[in-house]
Amino acid sequence: MRRLLFTIAFVALCGCGVRATLAEDVTVIHAARLLDVKAGRLISPAVVVVKGERIEGVGAAAAPSGARTIELGDVTVLPGLIDCHTHLMGDIQWDEYGTTLLTKSQAYRALEGAAHARRMLHAGFTTVSDEGNEGSGYADVALRDAINAGLIEGPRLQVATRAIAALGQYQPFGVSPDLPDFPRGAQMVSGTDSVRRAVREQIANGADLIKVYADWDYPTLTVEELSVAVEEAHKAKRRVAAHATTVSGIRNALAAGADSIVHGWDADRQTLELMQQKGVWLVPTVGLSESRLAQADSAEERARCTKQLARTRAMMALAREVGVRIGSGYDAIEASAHGANAREIAALVHHGLSTLEAIQAATLHAAEMIGWSDRVGAVEPGKYADIIAVSGNPLEDVARLQQVRFVIKGGTVVKTPVP
């Protein structure tokens, strides 16, 4: 027994020594330019010192002699991108939603999520707020934990698990009343006690944040129900993201104390001013609508997408004018959308943001929105070494972010430039 304990202790000490040695490894990244997302300017040349998982220093003076180097050449390095609203478990067409829930196991959907997560990481998204797993139980918790354990590649994840919607007010619709146990895309609630139980259950099972559907074409959850969700989430130091498109739905979410509004398409000036006063974030999700317009195969679909984009463009002009804080989120729910999330950054520019503002919405400001500004969102000492590289100057051509050439996450290179 004593020999066994000695062996275990010896192995543990050796293991600690190996980890300590790895943590002391220093790498110096050289590139033509660094985008300082705080100052909004390029620094040339770029020198970033990485020690273990973290950024040790920035600038030539910080580079120690004899360190391992990565020479990236004529590229611009910048912080890893952040998507503030995705559905990684989503490989769903709306007209096949019920069929998907019936035919795909949660294990299979977790594997789909793993594939989508890897695709996003290689596209330069090193952090993701995944806001609703569309009926896959707690598979997103397993995905997050597997990434954190190093079992699979993927971004740093915050997950909202099942999301919460009013009874009968989320997909799939049109299910026979004879099938009360038919799987749903969100956890259905009715009444404040039901809401409280759902929030507590989701947090107990690993939710990093709570997602609520404040409306669906019209307000669904009441202010009282939303307030209970916010109360329970905030007690557990979780933020609340509210899906809301209507003025009434947005105002209900604001009255309840939600931390962010997802979509917000019909918000008027007064509502946006209230958001600004309360410091509530807006994630307008405009990029996927642009993509759907481009892919529309009928006059009816093109008209619908065109109308929605016009609404969104008007809302965005007001939001920018009154100073609402904006985070970038692509709302990817279809397989083809995962990894194409940088389209959202370009779409924000199409909707009136400057290129710097759009990039900040996917880096510096996104990190603040999700509560991780102490660890990601900028290339500066102390933050995780989550760094990407693109050709050219993204301040002049934001589409460069759709062609990421190099990705390092937590000091580990996951994508290298192809010669």
Describe each PLM feature range.
Residues L34, A39-L78, T99-T100:
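Histidine-rich, glycine-flanked metal-binding segment
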Residues V75-L151, E224, S248, N252-A256:
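Metal-associated gating/positioning segment near the N- to mid-region
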Residues G98-L111, G174-R197:
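Active-site mouth loops of central-metabolism enzymes
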Residues E112-Y138, G154-R162, N205-D217, R239, ...:
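Divalent metal-dependent hydrolysis catalytic cores, especially in the metallo-beta-lactamase
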Residues I92-D95, D140, T220, I250-A256, ...:
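Histidine/acidic-residue-rich catalytic or RNA/ligand-binding cores of hydrolases
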Residues F6-G17:
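Bacterial N-terminal signal peptides
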Residues T100-L101, K235-K237, Q308-P394:
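His/Asp/Glu-enriched, well-ordered alpha-helical/loop segment
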Residues D145-A163, T220-T245, G279, V283-G287:
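Alpha-helix-loop-beta-strand connector modules within alpha/beta enzyme cores
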